[in-house]
Regions:
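Long, positively charged amphipathic alpha-helical accessory segments at protein N-termini or as interdomain linkers
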Residues: 2-48, 60-89, 106-186
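Active-site-flanking beta-strand signature of metal-NTP-handling nucleotidyl enzymes
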Residues: 52-57
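Catalytic palm active-site di-aspartate
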Residues: 92-104
């Protein structure tokens, strides 16, 4: 592995450890690969200028059937991170279940992974929530069904800022879930 776990490249909240991949890396696949050995709080991200790609390893304490709700906590954290950097009055919506739209255009989405063969009635060894957001496109899309953060007015947004913001919001959502139940999160 050419990159090492290093928290110095991102301003992450306590409990997170960062692993940066080169441009062509797949953050989600890498997080799934190392989830069992690295554990909860491992945040894998890809160093790209055109795309935010991040995946976080989670270790739920409830059965897989309900632990999958972590997906909604991840999507809510993504929305909160985007809202913190979003131009005023920019419409942002989710298209069920995993797509994020800005002003009607596809800008990104999330996904959730768990170990093959995990028992629905037992806590899985790990979950991985992955998020991908388009920062910029080389050319303007012909159709209005796709967009980027740059095209929607997120000027000069560094991927590292958005990833760190996502991690902070994710931590808040999981803490809320732990203290007050899932209802305030989902």
């Amino acid at each position: 592995m050419s990159s090492a776990l290093s928290e110095t490249s991102l301003d992450l909240p306590p409990g997170f450890r960062a692993l940066a991949l080169r441009e062509l890396g797949d953050a989600f696949a890498k997080a799934v690969e190392i989830a069992g050995e690295q554990g909860a709080g491992t945040l894998v991200w890809t160093r790209r200028f055109d795309l935010v790609e991040v995946a976080v390893v989670l270790e739920p304490e409830e059965p897989l059937v309900t632990a999958r709700r972590a997906f909604f906590a991840g999507m809510s954290a993504a929305a909160d991170a985007l809202a913190a950097h979003c131009p005023p009055e920019k419409p942002m919506v989710f298209a069920w279940p995993d797509t994020i739209l800005l002003d009607g255009g596809l800008v990104g989405g999330g996904r959730l992974g768990w170990p093959d063969g995990a028992d629905e009635k037992k806590p899985p060894d790990w979950l991985v929530f992955g998020l991908m957001l388009r920062l910029m496109m080389p050319t303007a899309p012909a159709a209005r069904d796709r967009t980027s953060l740059e095209a929607e007015g997120f000027e000069m947004l560094e991927p590292r800022e958005l990833i760190a913001s996502f991690a902070r919001h994710l931590m808040v959502h999981f803490e809320t879930w732990r203290e007050r139940g899932f209802q305030p999160v989902g």
